[in-house]
Amino acid sequence: MKLIYSEEAVDNLRRFDPVERQLIAKKLRYLAENFEALRGTKKVRELKGTRYPDQYRFVIARKIRAIFRVDGDRLVLLILRIGRRKDVYE
């Protein structure tokens, strides 16, 4: 699958230090390569009660999450937001 970052996700990513950015990039590449295997596990869950269907969250680290959407027609993961667990769901 191809990864595409929203403008908000890119801005979110800039707030992390370089070591965390490398970890996030590595984990998101792993997600893109293994999405079907990870779907429905504790690491990747579909979000409920959101405005848009097919939104998921991905646990990158203990306190870091990514919110993303799957565009099934093009096999694309659109990364919507990246942030600390306490802030990313707002």
List each language-model region with its residue ranges.
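Short, solvent-exposed aromatic-acidic interface loops
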Residues: 80-84
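Basic, Lys/Arg-enriched alpha-helical interface segments
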Residues: 1-63, 70-77, 87-90
